Amino acid sequence: DKVRAGDAVNFSIGQGDTVLTPLKLTQMYAAIANGGTIWQMMIAKAIVKTDGTVVKTFTPKRLGTVKTAPSNLAFLRGSLREVVTTGTAAGAFAGFPVEISGKTGTAEVFGRNPDGSAKDDTSWFASYAPTKNPRYAVVMMVGQGGFGASTSGVGVRRIYESLFGVTGGKVVPGAALFPEGKPPTKLPKISPATKPKEASK
């Protein structure tokens, strides 16, 4: 099959035959945020027994780098910040006290629902924060969720509110999911498991 000019246009905006998972997009945004390094995705830091013994630790694996000039990355990062300040995500993040960078996405869906109605768009929002010293990359996709800003953008804001402890447009000390809104660098302390009581005779 030949790729037509229209297909190339679709690819450039993430539609048509473009297939991407939220996890993969998160990996891409993390690379943009950290200056271009692509890291292997991980869901665990270590395996720890109930008595606190560390069985195995997992070291982050560097997969490569984004092949582009630093000036291109700088331009992209500046553009992602403007999306949240003056662009399509400005409303979703209005008054947010932590600088967020990201991009809304609204992907058209072909077909109809069982009731005959047209399927709604797929809502996306991909981001990282804080803008100047990134700690998190957060991506949300909602099938038939409508516009990226009004559904996924609002949802991602709620996630950042928990991560940074934001209430009423202010960062509340002690309210963040992790202390000071920073992901932990050390393993948590695990107390020995409670021994089960013997059954009464």
Residue spans of the language-model regions?
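Active-site beta-strand/loop architecture of penicillin-binding DD-peptidases
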Residues: 1-64, 71, 77-170, 201
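Long, low-complexity, intrinsically disordered segments
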Residues: 191-201
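Intrinsically disordered, low-complexity mixed-charge segments
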Residues: 165-192
